[in-house]
């Protein structure tokens, strides 16, 4: 668990410390409460969120203390974020670049912003994972230029202006989550290399291959049936795959 010194500012904003080097720190403005509210406003559109709320209400009505497995408390969006974080750790460890791995705030923000732009809230975990990673792969064009092709003009979750990367915190316009990308040009290159790798791994309609890849990601030899049930299985549903040409 990371613990940072903090002090209140205004409304839901607080000041957190940012280590510049071994001898210097600076205060920067953060807004974790509003960020959580922003995330929930999008996450709650997914069907699993409604099931969780209904079950919680049922437990309260019965005054039950029975707990559900952690896996139940996940929408498909939350599970995609979880899978990406696990896979990120494995990927950067395998290439011995752990000090350059993409931060969790970027993963959560990008996934949620992409999910916000789609009407496909009924997608199960595997299809939402493929949708999000395919969308993010488009932004790899920005490695060599400042603007995406005209056909992608509506895609703005990652920007590049005057050779500077921008992933803006949705509740704090002063917070560019991609600041470190502008200090180390290898970071965005590794990010898109990782995104392409995970996209390829899960770009399959074969259920056995999908669960094999998922098992490898989580370091488990086998996934039990409950996990498979909540993750969902890959399906060939062309209308639900808007990222395909």
Q: Model-derived features: where do they sit?
A:
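Short acidic (Asp/Glu) and glycine-rich catalytic loops that position anionic groups and cofactors
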Residues: 60-61, 107-110, 173
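Hydrophobic, mid-to-C-terminal alpha-helical segments
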Residues: 74, 84-144
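Sequence-structural signature of the catalytic-core scaffold of metal-dependent phosphohydrolases
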Residues: 6-8, 14-15, 67-71, 106
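Long, charge-rich alpha-helical interaction segments
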Residues: 27, 32-78, 82-83
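Conserved catalytic core of two-metal-ion nucleotidyltransferases
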Residues: 1-38
């Amino acid at each position: 668990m990371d613990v940072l010194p903090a002090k209140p500012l205004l409304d839901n904003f607080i000041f957190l410390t940012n280590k510049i080097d071994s001898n210097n720190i600076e205060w920067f403005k953060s807004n974790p409460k509003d960020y959580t509210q922003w995330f929930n406003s999008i996450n709650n559109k997914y069907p699993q969120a409604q099931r969780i709320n209904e079950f919680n209400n049922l437990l309260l009505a019965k005054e039950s203390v029975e707990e559900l497995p952690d896996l139940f408390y996940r929408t498909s969006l939350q599970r995609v974020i979880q899978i990406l974080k696990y896979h990120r750790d494995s990927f950067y460890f395998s290439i011995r670049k752990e000090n350059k791995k993409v931060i969790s705030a970027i993963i959560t923000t990008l996934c949620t912003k992409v999910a916000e732009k789609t009407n496909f809230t009924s997608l199960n975990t595997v299809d939402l994972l493929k949708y999000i990673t395919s969308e993010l792969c488009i932004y790899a064009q920005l490695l060599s230029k400042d603007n995406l092709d005209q056909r992608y003009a509506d895609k703005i979750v990652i920007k590049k202006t005057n050779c500077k990367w921008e992933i803006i915190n949705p509740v704090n316009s002063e917070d560019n989550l991609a600041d470190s990308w502008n200090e180390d040009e290898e970071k965005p290159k590794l990010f898109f290399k990782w995104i392409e790798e995970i996209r390829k791994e899960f770009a399959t309609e074969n259920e056995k291959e999908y669960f094999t890849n998922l098992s490898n990601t989580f370091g488990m030899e086998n996934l039990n049936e409950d996990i498979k049930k909540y993750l969902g299985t890959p399906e060939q549903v062309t209308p639900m795959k808007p990222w395909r040409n």
